[in-house]
Design a protein with these regions (language model features):
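Structural motif
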Residues: 72-75, 131-132, 159-163, 324-325, ...
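Non-cysteine beta-strand/loop elements that form the S-adenosyl-L-methionine
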Residues: 75-77, 190-192, 349-354
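Active-site beta-loop-alpha junctions enriched in small/polar residues
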Residues: 29, 79-81, 138, 168, ...
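Metal-dependent amide/peptide-bond hydrolase catalytic core
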Residues: 215-399
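Divalent metal-coordination and catalytic microenvironments
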Residues: 24, 63, 76, 106, ...
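Acidic/His- and Gly-rich active-site-bordering loop/insert found
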Residues: 2-102, 111-127
Length: 399
């Protein structure tokens, strides 16, 4: 099947894919609770006669298309969970699950991969290797990608490269947006428990005010980026919550700070963590208090393989059109657990545009009015299919 035939098939399937997307959008489910979504995906795979394993890492599914004797293959991932947001779009297919919404486009991601599955199945005998389709749960919370990989998802057959995509409401429909290398940051959860000595507000000299101590710690942490890290190195230490004190006339004895650390590589992450601990503990000690620092590493940095990124960009330029590729000037300090895949095998994560000029509803991820242009589904399917075929061709040539 050539690219013209693939494009024609996408056009033929588009109306039904929109119906699938709207059904998923109407019935969003939170991380770890994607029961209906899992069943809906399985029903579509059953119609196509595609072999799969369900119940992976909770409600995830791994499907495989291609030669039964394939010794290697590529993987494509779509996340399937929704967010705890009450939808306000007023669309006829708006969420019927109160307080839950597909506000991050995972309904689009799932639909795109199901659309690609149809084409892969139609040309199964032409595939030069296996294509494994990862319908991944729990991206928004615990990182379902890591658990799917732990399920031995990247073997049987051996996966040589991996692809993933995300909708991007800042990019026009029909364009893709990606980084050649560094794409997203790592995350580390940060908790600092400041322990002072509570006392009456009229006699602050008789205690150690934990709120004052915590305030100095918060300010001092910002010097990590301005005075310790190189000016060209992106470093983020965010304190998102401060909890302390019980009464307006009492100097607090305890304060809890919570936030995140973000970096684009492990070396910088560890550098930040060391300085956070030193600053928090020594600042507290200077005031006669103590600080307990707890740091839990989350997602690793997401780094695209340069050769794979350039291959995908070339596919877009040739098949969507010149000017359809927008390379990122700088990496994003956001995070995505697709990084677990790219930390294991070379891969590429790219964004597909969902912004349509003159669209009535505002475009913003994690927003209660998020309403992406459904035309993006066509481009997502096209890039998944033609991108996978390009990578399989390249990997066969190297074999």
């Amino acid at each position: 099947m050539n690219s013209a035939q693939i494009k024609a098939m996408i056009e033929d399937e588009f109306e039904e894919l929109v119906e699938i997307r709207r059904d998923l959008h109407m019935h969003p489910e939170l991380s770890e609770h994607e029961e209906r979504t899992e069943k809906a995906i399985c029903a579509q795979l059953d119609k196509l006669g595609i072999a799969y394993e369900a119940g992976v890492a909770g409600h995830g599914i791994i499907a495989t298309v291609g030669p039964k004797d394939a010794k290697y293959g590529i993987a494509i991932r779509a996340d399937i969970d929704a967010l705890p947001i009450t939808e306000c779009t007023g669309l006829p297919y708006a969420s019927v699950n109160k307080g839950v919404m597909h506000a991050c486009g995972h309904d689009i991601h799932t639909t795109v991969l199901l659309g690609a599955a149809r084409i892969f199945k139609a040309m199964e005998n032409e595939l030069k290797g296996a294509v494994k389709l990862f319908f991944q749960p729990a991206e928004e919370t615990v990182g379902g990608a890591e658990r799917m990989i732990a399920h031995d998802g990247l073997n049987s057959p051996k996966i040589k490269r991996v692809m993933g995509m995300h909708v991007d409401p800042t990019v026009p429909t029909g364009c893709i947006h990606l980084a050649k290398s560094r794409m997203n940051a790592s995350t580390t959860e940060l908790i600092i428990n400041v322990n002072g000595v509570a006392c009456h507000g009229a006699h602050p000299d008789q205690g150690v005010d934990a709120i004052v101590v915590a305030s100095h710690i918060v300010l001092a942490l910002q010097t990590i980026s301005s005075r310790f890290a190189a000016p060209t190195t992106p470093v983020i230490v965010t304190i998102g919550t401060i909890h302390g004190g019980s009464k307006e006339n009492v100097c607090a004895g305890q304060v809890k700070l919570a936030g995140t650390i973000r970096a684009l590589d492990f070396e910088t992450r560890d550098f930040i963590k060391a300085h956070v601990k030193t600053i928090a503990e020594n600042t507290a000690a200077a005031f006669g208090a103590s600080a307990e620092v707890i740091m839990n590493d989350g997602y690793p940095p997401l780094v695209n393989d340069v050769a794979t990124s350039l291959a995908i960009a070339d596919v877009a330029e040739k098949e969507i059109g010149r000017g359809s590729v927008i390379f990122m000037d700088d990496p994003s300090l956001g995070a995505d657990d697709f990084a677990y895949f790219t930390s294991k095998v070379p891969g590429v994560y790219f964004n597909i545009g969902t912004y349509k000029e003159g669209q009535a509803l505002p475009q913003a991820l994690h927003n209660e009015n998020f309403a992406p242009d459904e035309e993006c589904i066509k481009y997502g399917v096209l890039m998944n299919v033609l991108g996978a075929l390009r990578l399989l061709d390249e990997d066969e040539a190297k074999a």
